């Protein structure tokens, strides 16, 4: 039913757009094939692609629909809330929906979960064994808490994959969701990237018939100084190698070089700002904090996260 409605609505929207938004010359040019209007059926006062600032939305809580969401206290809840945000907001636009640097977004919630699990183990251990040395308890608690957080990451990514590939939007399709990752250097930031890649590699489905899912599309943010060739001398070698292993088994991740040549690398080298792709191929031009389209001074930095575009010819 959603697909049928979408086909009818898209045809109506396309005709309304031609009637009320295009000049006679533009309509003739489109008819003759000189121009092509991308996504004409969905361009009536809607957002095309965006770099959604999920981290800022979750911080301190937010209101969505008729419900107030408190900021997640732990990692498992953060995954649930992030999934709700993506499904709700991506359905209100028609282009690519990107969650930039998702590893850094989930990092603080993983830290909170680790502390919870660590204290949980220590409380139980103290009640059971009074004579054991505190440092032994501490080592065991660290392993217990780390393993629990790792499992939370695995289950969280599995849940995200299930949501994004099973819950269709009112447009009659599944939102084109992209996540960029690979630059977080902390213990749990790296764990976020590695588990995302490993879960995608394993795929979803019945045992023996699993296959990689379409969404989220994964884009690996490659920094030569951090990832290098994957040897141990680089701080993010394990993340890089997880990406290589995932690429060998699936179509993802896409690789975006931040230290090579071109516009994206230029923004990163000069400002340390990431230009994540919106969906699959669209990159925003810079908008500066003080100067707008052009930098006001040498200290003026571009903003990318939290912005969107309105379509193109």
Predicted regions and their residues:
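Conserved catalytic cores of very large enzyme subunits
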Residues: 2-313
């Amino acid at each position: 039913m959603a697909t049928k409605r979408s086909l009818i609505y898209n045809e109506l929207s396309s005709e309304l757009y031609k009637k009320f938004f295009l000049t006679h010359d533009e309509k003739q040019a489109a008819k003759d094939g000189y121009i092509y209007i991308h996504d004409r059926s969905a361009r009536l006062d809607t957002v095309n692609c965006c770099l959604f600032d999920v981290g800022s939305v979750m911080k301190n809580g937010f209101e969505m629909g008729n419900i107030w969401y408190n900021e997640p206290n732990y990692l498992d809840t953060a995954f649930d809330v992030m999934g709700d945000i993506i499904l709700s907001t991506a359905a209100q636009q028609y282009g690519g929906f990107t969650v930039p640097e998702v590893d850094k977004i989930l990092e603080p919630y993983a830290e909170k979960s680790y502390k919870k699990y660590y204290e949980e183990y220590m409380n139980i251990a103290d009640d059971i064994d009074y004579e054991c040395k505190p440092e032994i308890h501490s080592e065991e608690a660290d392993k217990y808490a780390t393993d629990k957080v790792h499992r939370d990451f695995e289950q969280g990514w599995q849940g995200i994959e299930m949501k994004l590939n099973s819950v269709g939007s009112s447009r009659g399709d599944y939102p084109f969701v992209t996540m960029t990752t690979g630059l977080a250097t902390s213990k749990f930031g790296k764990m976020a990237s590695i588990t995302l890649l490993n879960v995608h590699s394993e795929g979803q489905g019945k045992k023996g018939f699993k296959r990689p899912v379409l969404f989220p599309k994964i884009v690996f943010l490659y920094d030569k100084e951090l990832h290098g060739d994957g040897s141990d001398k680089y701080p993010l070698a394990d993340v890089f190698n997880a990406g290589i292993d995932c690429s060998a088994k699936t179509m993802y991740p896409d690789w975006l070089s931040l230290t090579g040549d071109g516009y994206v690398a230029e923004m990163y080298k000069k400002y340390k700002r990431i230009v994540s792709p919106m969906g699959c191929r669209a990159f925003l031009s810079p908008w500066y904090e003080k100067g707008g389209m052009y930098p006001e001074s040498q200290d003026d930095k571009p903003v990318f996260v939290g912005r969107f575009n309105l379509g193109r010819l």
